[in-house]
Amino acid sequence: MATELRSGYTTGACAAAGVKAAFLFLQGKPWQEISLTALDGTPLTIPVKAVTQTEDGICAEVVKFSGDDPDITNGVSVYTTLRLRDDADGIVFRAGEGVGTVTKPGMSLPVGEPSINQGPRELIRRVVAEMTGREDTGAEVTIAIPAGTELAKRTLNPVLGIEGGISVIGTTGVLRPMSEEAFKDSLVPQIDVARAAGEEVLVFVPGKIGQRIALSLGISQKAIIETSNFIGFMLERAAERGTKGVLILGHTGKLVKIAAGIFHTHNRMADARLETLAAYAAAEGLSQTDVRAVLAANTTEDALAVIASAGLAERVCAVIAARVRIRAERYLFGKMKVGAVMVNFAGEILGVDEQARAFADACGWRLNA
């Protein structure tokens, strides 16, 4: 029987527990273990490591527990400082060390606000109301996650314009082992930020290598969207938002899958890379012996070397890029224009379709293939 995965609690729940611990400290009551009700009604019990009085208020430290979710903040300390204010109505949120600040429009929070999402804010408001018996208690809540300054480099925050650290997140307060759907949804705000910045043509790349290559072609960082393996999902989200067009820029291994109609490109979902290359190369005149060599290749780069030795690489790559466009636009039922640029790991352009060239001319990109 499969073992049930353990749930944990979010950084937002850690902060809310810290606020409640601060109130209990002020009241002279035990604060070492905090009971909370998550926004979805789930009861939470969160241990508190320390509570101290500082010049800025009462500071509580809670160590994040992520359960069986592969979360980068597992084990980090979340410090929440509570300062009650008679001169204010409601709660003012502040970003402490390692918590980011919103610097670009398009997010759910205004520019200049600490990146403390609405779920944690609401959970903290409920805690303050519970502990004071009032909805309008004046308070200043500062959340610091010192490890967040470095951890943010491993997130999409720099792309989203969240500077200075990570975000305090959590929809309900409960951290359940991340589903694929949750990961996909975490990618979508990139599109909103790019659209808010005025980018009408977006550039989809699977990861950091694609991003580096895109920048080398003169493509604006604001237009670059990391999609991971979820090309189809992200195309749909872009089309829903009225995006004028998308350029798909990626390595041969990704683009040949899209040319075959595969829009979730993880190798456990589907892997017809060599078969697709072999089919298009054969259609362009590759010999039967070389087709077998393509099918026996270890990688798409090895397969392309076989095709190149026959003098067909340029033609085959151009056909594949064109086929990516056709497949993607068909996938979207013609709701958005799509172009394709295929590159190798060295960043050399192997294939470009006509729509990609049109995008490049309009946007000033350098596509030299």
Predicted regions and their residues:
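Generic N-terminal targeting/processing segments that precede catalytic cores or assembly contacts
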Residues: M1-R154, P158-L160
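A structural signal for small-residue-enriched, beta-sheet-centric alpha/beta enzyme cores
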Residues: R6-Y9, L160-I166, T171-L350
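Bulky hydrophobic/aromatic packing residues
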Residues: T155, F183, L187-D192, A356-R357, ...
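Short, amphipathic C-terminal "tail helix"
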Residues: K337-A369
